[in-house]
Amino acid sequence: VVRGGPRAAAWRIGAFIARHLFSLPAVVAATACAIAIPVHADGAAGATLARQHWVLNCMGCHTATGGGIPGKVPPLANSLGYFTHLPAGREYVMRVPGASNSALSDQDLADVLNWVLTTMNRDALPRDFKPYTAAEVAAHRRPAFSDVATVRAGLVRALQARGIDGVSDRY
């Protein structure tokens, strides 16, 4: 648990990014993300840690809002949750290279996925959504998909066949 609460943690994260990336926009984005996004995990401490893992491991590419970078990095906000409507989509979320190859433990990755899904994708989740577990992540996260765009496009077609149109096959 970080002393000083979430705001102190946000400033520490911002300072870390400033030291290592020397980027004022990254510091501002990290601080805003760490403070502004609501907590919905299994407790404030767990949610705070999951959010910190997001900031340090995911946000640099997927951006502070989870909106991604058009043409380069897919959005996570308001789209990732749709993939969990399909068993293959649920596996996809764990096997994209950034998740599969991350240095996060299986539990930490499960926590980050659950945090992203429950904070940025609430309306996209199936009604019977079950949070990821460390055991599930350990069983399915590797190997990473080598052609993630093709897998994604196939999943989007399967979602569209079920009447779910919330995510584009291109990003």
Which ranges hold each PLM region?
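The canonical Cys-X-X-Cys-His
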Residues: 54-64, 112
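Gly/Gly-Pro-rich "capping" loops immediately C-terminal to redox-active cysteine motifs
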Residues: 47, 67-102
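Internal catalytic or translocation cores that form aromatic/hydrophobic pockets or channels
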Residues: 103-111, 115
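Flexible coil segments in periplasmic/lumen-exposed cytochrome c-class electron-transfer proteins
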Residues: 107, 118-171
